[in-house]
Amino acid sequence: ADIVLLPGRAAFLPKTSTIVCSDIHLGKAATFRHAGMPIPEGSEQHDLKRLVNLIDVHKARRLLITGDLFHARSGCTPQVLEEFSKFCKQVQSSTSTDVVLVLGNHERSLGKKFQPYEIGISRCEQEIIEPPFHFVHDQTKHSNVQTGSFTIAGHVHPTITIKGTGRDRLTCRCFVTTGTTLTLPAFGSFTGGYNTQPPSRTR
């Protein structure tokens, strides 16, 4: 099955017309503001607009988020939840796009404050198996993978540092793939990254 890696930090599966992304971390800026840090607003709106653009360009019928859609309980403010709900209504009405979520570790920490079906998510699972694909958040938590399956996950926020001449360095978000797995970069603009040191059979 084909997987198209997109420069917008997401992947596209043409056969099922699915955009796959991970680690948006909506509400992270609000979480920091709640803790007294002077973080400007706007990152959530920017990321949701990027998603709308990807869906429009590829005419995707489904958006599948492999975990950590939201960041923390204190960041799930009425404004953040309303913005995401409006996003879901927009893509469902304009392109008939369903929004599907695989639960991440951050969703599990939200408790009763997280009501996915009340904000426009059409399906919410611990993992989704659609042979040959196996969608999870953290692939290290799912060891019983069927033979021949290909795991698509997030959680790690992979980055790579490119060294230039002198002391020049550029750190970029990246996809990491082996023969049986694909780790997606963090989609959210206001997220950190983990610098990968890929082994020989990893790209």
Regions found by a protein language model. Give the residues of each.
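Extended recognition/assembly regions associated with phosphoester-bond processing machinery
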Residues: 1-66, 70-203
